[in-house]
Amino acid sequence: MKNILAIQSHVVFGHAGNSAAEFPMRRLGANVWPLNTVQFSNHTQYGKWTGCVMPPSHLTEIVQGIADIGQLAHCDAVLSGYLGSAEQGEHILGIVRQVKAANPQAKYFCDPVMGHPEKGCIVAPGVAEFHVRYALPASDIIAPNLIELEILSKHSVNNVDDAVQAARELIAQGPEIVLVKHLARAGYSSERFEMLLVTAQEAWHISRPLVDFGSRQPVGVGDVTSGLLLVKLLQGATLQQALEHVTAAVYEIMIATKTMQEYELQVVAAQDRIANPEHYFSATRL
């Protein structure tokens, strides 16, 4: 069984960051070690919340505690997501180095959450710059959405070919695999939700139906997507297999959420279909 140190946000109510991804990842058969960068009452798109950002040293201290009991060598991957500060990011890269020293086979999966002001997702000053300058070259796998892909590649991305090219530009700087979590306006169809999975040799495209939630889109979809992809890849799935399973599993969560008329992702209700999706979407090699 694979062990994943997941360093991202936590909400007490609802699902975002680790609170969204942790259970689905476990449902696929991974051990998740959640380390929270923030603890908030709820996700920020409600417009108000309480809670705190963890001091950067807290992250390092927790991981040192795991090292002190001799367990860090059993960590197969570090996953990072929403950061409460750029300084937290620097500490996370130190943790990645520490984990890789204990287990040279360990991977670093970076979900470079950089904020969506129009969606109410706010990140601290310096976080975007941290991802561009430091996290990108340190990562083995990176999972930007379209906006984040443009920030990381430092140019606009207007179509699928542009996205593949931009992903390969990122690969030249460090990571082996790039997941473009949401192609949005750069995709083939505005009626579909599309993703890309790219390496130096391969590029896979997949699409699924959009699920209409009106003006209140559920939060945490990207967090679940990144976490599930990491689990599948660690378990030995091919790029195609991993992309197809993750796309179907996330769709099952979206359908359950819509059917139950909920705003928060219904990861518990959808748990059996996360492991064994009823829908199937075929990835195409470009």
Swiss-Prot record:
Organism equals: Salmonella typhimurium (strain LT2 / SGSC1412 / ATCC 700720)
Any one Gene Ontology MF annotation carried by this entry is: ATP binding
Entry's Gene Ontology BP terms: pyridoxal 5'-phosphate salvage
- In which residues is substrate bound? 9, 44-45, 223
EC number assigned by the record: 2.7.1.35
* Protein keywords: ATP-binding, Kinase, Magnesium, Nucleotide-binding, Transferase
Which segments cross the bilayer? none
In which pathway does this enzyme or protein participate? Cofactor metabolism; pyridoxal 5'-phosphate salvage; pyridoxal 5'-phosphate from pyridoxal: step 1/1
Q: Which reaction does it catalyse?
A: pyridoxal + ATP = pyridoxal 5'-phosphate + ADP + H(+)
Q: Which residues bind ATP?
A: 111, 143, 148, 181, 208-211
What Gene3D superfamilies would the database entry show? 3.40.1190.20
According to its record, what are the GO cellular component terms?
cytosol
Which Pfam families does the entry link to? Phos_pyr_kin
Q: Which cofactor does it need?
A: Mg(2+)
Which family is this sequence assigned to? Belongs to the pyridoxine kinase family. PdxY subfamily.
Please name the InterPro entries in this protein's record.
PM/HMP-P_kinase-1 (IPR013749), PyrdxlKinase (IPR004625), Pyridoxal_kinase_PdxY (IPR023685), Ribokinase-like (IPR029056)
What is this protein's function? Pyridoxal kinase involved in the salvage pathway of pyridoxal 5'-phosphate (PLP). Catalyzes the phosphorylation of pyridoxal to PLP.
Q: How does it assemble?
A: Homodimer.
Q: Give the protein name, as stated in the record.
A: Pyridoxal kinase PdxY
